[in-house]
């Protein structure tokens, strides 16, 4: 939720911000219309309350002097009726105005490219040594800043589906039969690799000052509304029938809501929290995309970074959590690029977002594996998370970033570390798996 005082004094800024994001500016217009009604009613209420006080004093004086106060009493009754009517109107206007506030997006940071479409995200850097099938060289160069750091493959690597089935580490048919599309069984050494990824990420973040939590996998409506953009996530979230509960799409939502309506002490900031959880997504808006395999699924495990900090520190923390994610993928040896997400693709909460996109040689393209966002005070206002200072109470800033979404990284490893009919385990994970290869037999 945006700062009402900031909005009132910067109407044009917020209308322009809607244009930057490619969303309707009608909510801003509606807010100012309702806010003027709210101010007008408040002015009338203040006048009526003053009038009531004057009439009440007259009544007291008349009674004291044995005078007739019937006219004044009738006037007070009429004033009370009018006050009650206006207070009811004011409450309805406040509710509608506050509802509209939830729909006005966060201000885009000045460093965000103002444009639309993922294809216009701004390349920040490319890192790594890629394996590129000869037919995909131009695609790779175009999206890596014309990097020459690659080796040419004469044959396209196997898809993770074909490789997983050949090695008996993925079962999609059984999952589809008992659960439907976009579900899966991960088996044998691939499951051990997934567990190794999780343990590696947890150790990595623990060494960098993050506390580790496993949050609730369900949130009530109030918490979910405060933590995320329900309108954007309406095609993503699973609602529990007959309950005021939603399955989480990411542990970010639970961690953010964990401190809702709380006051923090300035000395305790920043708070770095890493959440490990299953995530559940309907993917209703992804019809026809990635229908085979485990890249885009209804259920997956994820390690999430989350930071509560002081406003003046949040932009440094955005670079920190992005750097943490990059360090993980560099250590794994997965080639990737970082993009500065353009204004039209940010979502309502983020003031700025970076994506990390890994190179997938079997698919011949970069695909998103990490999103790192600074939501400034927008999410904290929605959840009412403040900290105490010597100069008064302030809202914290909140930031989040994927560390590892396991199914997508499994696919990245399967495509980038194929060696014939086997998969080589990245060196940093061997101490966690206890083996160097996934192979037949």
UniProtKB/Swiss-Prot annotation:
Pathway recorded for this protein: Aminoacyl-tRNA biosynthesis; selenocysteinyl-tRNA(Sec) biosynthesis; L-seryl-tRNA(Sec) from L-serine and tRNA(Sec): step 1/1
Pfam families, per the entry: Seryl_tRNA_N, tRNA-synt_2b
GO CC terms in record: cytoplasm
Residue positions binding L-serine: 250-252, 304, 402
GO BP annotations, alphabetical order: selenocysteine biosynthetic process; seryl-tRNA aminoacylation
Keyword Transmembrane: no
First-tier enzyme category under EC: ligase
Subunit structure: Homodimer. The tRNA molecule binds across the dimer.
HAMAP family, sorted: Ser_tRNA_synth_type1
Similarity field: Belongs to the class-II aminoacyl-tRNA synthetase family. Type-1 seryl-tRNA synthetase subfamily.
Protein name from the UniProt record: Serine--tRNA ligase
Taxonomic placement: Archaea, Methanobacteriati, Thermoplasmatota, Thermoplasmata, Thermoplasmatales
């Amino acid at each position: 939720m945006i700062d009402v005082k900031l909005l009132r004094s910067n109407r044009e800024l917020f209308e322009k911000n809607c244009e930057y994001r490619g969303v309707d500016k009608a909510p801003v217009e509606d807010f100012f219309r309702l806010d003027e009604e709210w101010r007008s009613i408040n002015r009338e209420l203040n006048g009526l309350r003053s009038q009531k006080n004057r009439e009440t004093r007259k009544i007291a004086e008349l009674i004291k002097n044995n005078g007739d106060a019937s006219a004044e009493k009738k006037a007070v009754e009429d004033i009370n009726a009018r006050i009650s009517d206006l207070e009811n109107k004011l409450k309805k206007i406040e509710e509608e105005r506050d509802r509209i506030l939830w729909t006005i997006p966060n201000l885009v940071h000045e460093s965000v490219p103002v444009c639309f479409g993922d294809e216009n995200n701004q390349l920040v850097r490319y890192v790594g040594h890629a394996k590129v099938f000869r037919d995909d060289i131009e695609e790779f160069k175009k999206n890596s800043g014309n990097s020459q750091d690659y080796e040419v493959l004469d044959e396209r690597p196997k898809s993770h589906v074909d490789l997983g089935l050949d090695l008996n580490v993925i079962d999609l048919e059984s999952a589809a039969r008992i659960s439907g599309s976009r579900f899966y069984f991960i088996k044998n050494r691939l499951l051990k690799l997934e567990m190794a990824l999780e343990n590696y990420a947890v150790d990595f973040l623990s060494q960098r000052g993050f506390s580790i939590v496993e949050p609730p996998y369900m949130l009530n409506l109030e918490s979910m509304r405060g933590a995320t953009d329900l309108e954007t996530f309406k095609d993503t979230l699973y609602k529990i029938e007959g309950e005021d509960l939603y399955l989480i799409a990411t542990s970010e939502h639970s961690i953010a809501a964990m401190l809702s309506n709380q006051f923090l002490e300035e000395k305790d900031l920043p708070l770095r929290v890493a959440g490990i959880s299953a995530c559940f997504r309907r993917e209703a808006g992804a019809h026809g995309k990635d229908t085979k395999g485990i890249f885009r699924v209804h259920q997956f495990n994820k390690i999430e970074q989350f930071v509560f900090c002081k406003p003046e520190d949040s932009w440094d923390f955005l670079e920190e959590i992005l750097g943490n994610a990059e360090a993980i993928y560099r250590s794994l040896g997965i080639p990737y690029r970082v993009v500065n997400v353009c204004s039209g693709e940010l979502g309502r909460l983020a003031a700025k977002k970076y994506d990390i996109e890994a190179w997938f040689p079997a698919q011949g393209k970069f695909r998103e594996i990490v999103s790192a966002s600074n939501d400034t005070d927008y999410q904290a206002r929605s959840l009412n998370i403040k900290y105490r200072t010597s100069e008064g109470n302030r809202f914290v800033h909140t930031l989040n970033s994927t560390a590892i979404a396991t199914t997508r990284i499994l696919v990245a490893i399967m495509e980038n570390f194929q060696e014939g009919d086997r998969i080589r385990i990245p060196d940093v994970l061997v101490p966690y798996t206890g083996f160097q290869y996934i192979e037949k037999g």
